[in-house]
Amino acid sequence: MKEELIERFTRYVKIDTQSNEDSHTVPTTPGQIEFGKLLVEELKEVGLTEVTMDDNGYVMATLPANTDKDVPVIGFLAHLDTATDFTGKNVKPQIHENFDGNAITLNEELNVVLTPEQFPELPSYKGHTIITTDGTTLLGADDKAGLTEIMVAMNYLIHNPQIKHGKIRVAFTPDEEIGRGPAHFDVEAFGASFAYTMDGGPLGGLEYESFNAAGAKLTFNGTNTHPGTAKNKMRNATKLAMEFNGHLPVEEAPEYTEGYEGFYHLLSLNGDVEQSKAYYIIRDFDRKNFEARKNTIENIVKQMQEKYGQDAVVLEMNDQYYNMLEKIEPVREIVDIAYEAMKSLNIEPNIHPIRGGTDGSQLSYMGLPTPNIFTGGENYHGKFEYVSVDVMEKAVQVIIEIARRFEEQA
């Protein structure tokens, strides 16, 4: 199993599948289509049936039941794309067997070193086989680790028919990293009662609470004149953007928050005197606090419009996804089964809120309750990203055990 995990994962991460927020195609990048087509062939090779890839790049497949029991159809999902935060082109995965727990020089020439001082969890992987970057790209364990684990688990179940299970559906979705993963997902065609995203982090992660999320695009319009004769004429758009940001509470930003605390995050700011554009994301676990945060944004905009004119600030704000807890609670047994599966494998479940979102956040509101499970990755979206193959193996075992328990309890 370990060899298959390494072979598949290192091959998959070399395919550039970064999504692109500025693209209006579905999927947003051709690499995701290329990867999807490859997976269609490999799912067929493994022995799955009803393997499809639709015009939007969504890959689906079926592992038929091998029991006569009436077992609910369950699904396992992962996403095809990788993050846009750092380059994902020409990924060169580095395999470190029997890791000694000490610092790893990822790139001597660029002096990129993965250290326990900067990443205190690193020594806990002593003795593991870990896969890192070469210090020039992200790795793509988010979410090619989860995708690999699903492939390996399905292969294992096919070759071990003594493990009884109901019908299992598999799906690989595009554009998760830019919040569009479920946008064209056909829940009815998928046909599962429940699902799990394999899109978590370290060993034991079991998540069924996510942020409520919104995005706010602000355009600040200025008036540019010669600075020598600008008095009472110039309106500096970039300064308007700075003024707006100054109205937000400093301590309610990602770098100052944790746990169940929400935030405002200035994701990008660019412009000049004539026009400046800012993009914020708004996050909170509590629905009332979430609405209050959006109201704060709107109120600041109104104040500035009253001060500088209606055209000075233009706001576009849209909800992106909601806390999945509301939709998971009525079917809490799907969390309990995953919890029990981990415990039976001597894995201590680590239940905590997702300070982010998964496809499951949106899918749960589309009628497919979908908690999230660990994959073994650390430090996602950057050059210090790595994954433990030993933990990936545990994730495969959890998938298998969940499938077995649903059949056993039917």
UniProtKB/Swiss-Prot annotation:
PROSITE patterns to which the protein is assigned, alphabetical: ARGE_DAPE_CPG2_1, ARGE_DAPE_CPG2_2
A UniProt-annotated Pfam family = Peptidase_M20
Record carries keyword Nuclease: no
What's the superkingdom here? Bacteria
Record's catalysed reaction(s): Release of the N-terminal residue from a tripeptide
Instruction: Tell me the residue numbers annotated for binding Zn(2+) 1.
Output: H79, D142, D199
Annotated positions binding Zn(2+) 2 = D142, E177, H381
The protein's required cofactors: Zn(2+)
CDD domains in the cross-refs: M20_peptT (cd03892)
Q: Name one GO molecular function term.
A: metallopeptidase activity
The UniProt note on the cofactor reads as follows: Binds 2 Zn(2+) ions per subunit.
What's its EC? 3.4.11.4
Q: Which residues form the active site?
A: D81, E176 (proton acceptor)
Could you say which enzyme class this protein belongs to? hydrolase
SUPFAM superfamilies recorded for this chain?
A: Bacterial exopeptidase dimerisation domain, Zn-dependent exopeptidases
Q: What does this protein do?
A: Cleaves the N-terminal amino acid of tripeptides.
Matching entries from PANTHER family are given as:
PEPTIDASE T
* Protein name per Swiss-Prot or TrEMBL: Peptidase T
Species in which this protein is naturally found: Bacillus thuringiensis (strain Al Hakam)
**Phylogenetic classification of the source organism:** Bacteria, Bacillati, Bacillota, Bacilli, Bacillales
Underlying gene: pepT
